[in-house]
Amino acid sequence: MFFVKGEGFFYPLFIELRNLIRYQTTRVSNSSRDFNLSQQHCSCFRPKRRHEAHLSFIGTLQYSKQRTITRAASATIARRQLLLLFDITFSSSSSCYYFQKKAEKKLNRRRRFDTKYEDAADLLEKARDSYKLAKSWDQAGIAYLKLADCHLKANSLANTYMIMDECMDHEIAEYYESDEMFEQAIAYYETAAEFFQIEEVTTSANQCNLKVAQYASQLEQQSRFMKTQARHSLNNKLLKYGVKGHLLTAGMCHLCKADVVSITNALEKYQDLDPTFSGTRECKFLADLASAIDEEDIAKFTDVSKEIDSVSPLVWAVNHMQLFGCKLCLVLDHDNNVVEGKREVQGQGAGGGCKLYLIEGKCILDWNNVYTKRIYNYTNF
């Protein structure tokens, strides 16, 4: 049994329930035996007395039947209480042992057209999860191997590789993360997120994506992450309408690097990724803004910013950029005018709580009037 003799708060209750089940089960068996003996006893009488004994036997039988039903019900209730007690008192290791032993019994049975491998795989998955919760990593690894073997024998090789890849990619990413090799960690977290999305494990996929966003911001690869998000959204019917928003955010990350060639190449890639993006106002906005930055045309920069902000406020895109931990800081003079060095900056987009500034060929974003406060440091993306 799963209980150690004399140990545990629930041990006396367990013993009482176990004895009750044994007692009621024995009494049910005795009732059946009494029934058989009474029937044999009636056959020994003469016909007249046999009739009287038969009537007496019918009454006894009805009473015995009712008593048997009551005892069986008591035993059933006791079994349920015992199972509930198991659920309360099972430790993680006990449940692991239970699932693993049950899986082994499934594998040992021999029947034609049997689904023992599928049934054992379900039990081994529960054992694996229990071992992981108990942080018994060696036993969890053994459960993984047995699970893979079950899938192989059940002719589900693809499912086996999916399980192994899902596990290994996440663990490899954590290994690179611990060694501060963030570029490699990003690649494996992206792969793990894809597997989780295929299996519709949204929580785990979001955790992997947050890791990608965190390290992408440290490596100044925010645009890469937003492009990846756009690619995933294209494959989802419910999310495909948000693709242009992701690409807009990715393009604005390129703009903030003041690299016109980079944004031009990025726009070409975005159009290859989503052919409908070329006809959107977001694409036109990025192209016009890149041209204004390249020419250092403040008037054009202001007009383009006002035009897009009047139709679709940029706060959504900027808030997504803020998730990356990007710091947007400017230098203000005593009159709260934005300056770079000693040169006053003129020309800014207005409205929507989001403003764009052009400072010496660099695109700077301001949301919720953050620059009305006096900030004395300037940080690029």
From Swiss-Prot:
One of its GO terms (biological process) is intracellular protein transport. Its main location: membrane. InterPro entries: NSF_attach, TPR-like_helical_dom_sf. Keywords: ER-Golgi transport, Membrane, Protein transport, Transport. Coiled coil: none annotated. Pfam families: SNAP. It is a peripheral membrane protein. It is found in: Membrane. GO terms for cellular component: cytosol; plasma membrane. Binds to the syntaxin SYP21 and to NSF. Required for vesicular transport between the endoplasmic reticulum and the Golgi apparatus. Binds to SNARE complex and then recruits NSF to disassemble it. This is Alpha-soluble NSF attachment protein 1. It comes from Arabidopsis thaliana (Mouse-ear cress). The gene is ASNAP1.
